[in-house]
Amino acid sequence: MQCPHCHHNSSRVVDSRPTDGGRAIRRRRECENCGFRFTTFERVEQTPLLVIKKNGTREEFNREKILKGLIRAAEKRPVTMEQMQSIVDSVENQLRAIGENEVSSQAIGEFVMSKLADVDDVAYIRFASVYRQFKDMSVFMQELQDMMKKEKTKK
């Protein structure tokens, strides 16, 4: 495995353990050249999942795009990387469980928001504001009110 730090082609596995309910293997590696430690994940390769974007174009599903959006939404919030990875895993599992090779970006956004709402309200609102592209303050306020109603019914 190539080192992300020095790009040397040799590393050794320091630790290896199952993760994601046994569907993946997490490996902790150390570069034999510079000693840099990094983590890799090994998963079974799935059939490609295509995302139908709002403009009708299609692109391959990319877990990293969701993770980057979550990281941005959860900035300076008490949301761990593990929680965000878990959301991405859960969303991907939901998409694959549907059994379709193509899924709309809208469906992906809704899945992400439903999971994020259970983790952190502020991160949810941040994600929703970008995803739903609120046009004005009234739409934003309506989303907050809807969220507050759901919160009251939980208690």
Swiss-Prot record:
Cofactor(s) named in the record: Zn(2+)
Annotated ranges, domain ATP-cone: 49-139
Protein name (database record): Transcriptional repressor NrdR
PANTHER family noted in UniProt: TRANSCRIPTIONAL REPRESSOR NRDR
Claim: Membrane is one of the keywords in the record: no
Family: Belongs to the NrdR family.
The organism of origin for this protein: Lacticaseibacillus paracasei (strain ATCC 334 / BCRC 17002 / CCUG 31169 / CIP 107868 / KCTC 3260 / NRRL B-441)
Transmembrane feature ranges: none
